[in-house]
């Protein structure tokens, strides 16, 4: 049985004071982590505030990126070793914005995934296609390729523990949402790809999120699909009431 995982991705929003105000508003209102795992991915400057809060609450913390080396002369990068020592649980890697604006490659993402596991955290590995690729009928092949490259040389145990987020680029921040059937179709392809690379047992354990204009209004329908185990939520996670509606979608 896969535990649902709803993760808010704040992107480059909220300072530490705004973070504390958000946390004060959700205090004591999150579901038990055994029912739905609630996660917030936040800018590095907010992580210490989140980690301190999470010690007494049903919340897990995620960084929005990390480097693939533990330390060294890499100005501006975030050390996975330091994130782990800080108490961070997850790291989002391969987000379409990182790929588009910062030139991240599948090889970079694979190296980051290994570094995250080596530092006892779990990657949330993002994948997804552009509108042009979808209209050309290339979605399944493209996403399967991204997953194959991202998981290269990871152990079966590591892959089983991973979270994979399908985020159709054409549905991020555009107001367009993949229908629940479209989202399920690609999430099924992701699970099939993992089964081919490893085996069905591993594929049945990996948790797959959908990310692309997820809101309280559509979360229950998405979560009703067989291969969708969670959401990676952008804008709708910035408001505490909206975030609470999302993580408490079961009622």
UniProtKB/Swiss-Prot annotation:
GO cellular component, as recorded: cytosol
Coiled-coil regions, chain positions: none
A biological process from GO: gluconeogenesis
Catalytic activity: D-glyceraldehyde 3-phosphate = dihydroxyacetone phosphate
Entry-linked InterPro entries: Aldolase_TIM, TIM_sf, TrioseP_Isoase_bac/euk, Triosephosphate_isomerase, Triosephosphate_isomerase_AS
Catalytic residues (positions): 95 (electrophile), 167 (proton acceptor)
Keyword Cytoplasm applies: yes
Keyword terms, alphabetized: Cytoplasm, Gluconeogenesis, Glycolysis, Isomerase
GO molecular function: triose-phosphate isomerase activity
Its EC number(s): 5.3.1.1
Residues the entry annotates as binding substrate: 9-11, 173, 213, 234-235
Gene3D superfamilies named among the record's database cross-references: Aldolase class I
Pfam families: TIM
Keyword Isomerase in annotation: yes
Enzyme class: isomerase
Known function: Involved in the gluconeogenesis. Catalyzes stereospecifically the conversion of dihydroxyacetone phosphate (DHAP) to D-glyceraldehyde-3-phosphate (G3P).
Family matches, as HAMAP family: TIM_B
The family this protein is said to belong to: Belongs to the triosephosphate isomerase family.
Protein name, entry field: Triosephosphate isomerase
Originating species: Pediococcus pentosaceus (strain ATCC 25745 / CCUG 21536 / LMG 10740 / 183-1w)
């Amino acid at each position: 049985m896969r535990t649902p995982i709803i993760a808010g991705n704040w992107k480059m929003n909220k300072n530490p004071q705004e973070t504390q105000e958000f946390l004060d508003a959700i205090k004591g209102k999150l579901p038990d982590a055994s029912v739905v795992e609630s996660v917030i991915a936040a800018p590095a400057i907010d992580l210490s505030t989140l980690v301190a809060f999470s010690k007494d609450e049903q919340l897990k913390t995620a960084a929005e990126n990390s480097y693939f080396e533990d330390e060294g002369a890499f100005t501006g990068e975030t050390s996975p070793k330091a994130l782990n020592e800080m108490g961070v649980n997850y790291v989002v890697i391969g987000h379409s914005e990182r790929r588009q604006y910062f030139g991240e490659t599948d090889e970079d993402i694979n190296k980051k995934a290994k570094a995250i596991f080596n530092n006892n955290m779990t990657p949330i590995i993002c994948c997804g296609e552009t509108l042009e690729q979808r209209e050309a009928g290339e979605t399944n092949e493209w996403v399967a390729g991204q997953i194959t490259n991202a998981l290269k040389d990871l152990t079966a145990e590591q892959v089983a523990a991973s979270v994979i987020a399908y985020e159709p680029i054409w549905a991020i921040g555009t107001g367009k949402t993949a229908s629940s059937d479209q989202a399920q179709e690609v999430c099924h392809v992701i699970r099939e790809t993992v089964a081919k690379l490893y085996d069905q047992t591993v594929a049945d354990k990996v948790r797959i999120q959908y990310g692309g204009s997820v809101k309280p209004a559509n979360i229950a329908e998405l979560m009703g699909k067989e291969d969708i185990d969670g959401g990676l939520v952008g804008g709708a996670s910035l408001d505490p009431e909206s975030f609470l509606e999302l993580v408490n979608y079961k009622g």
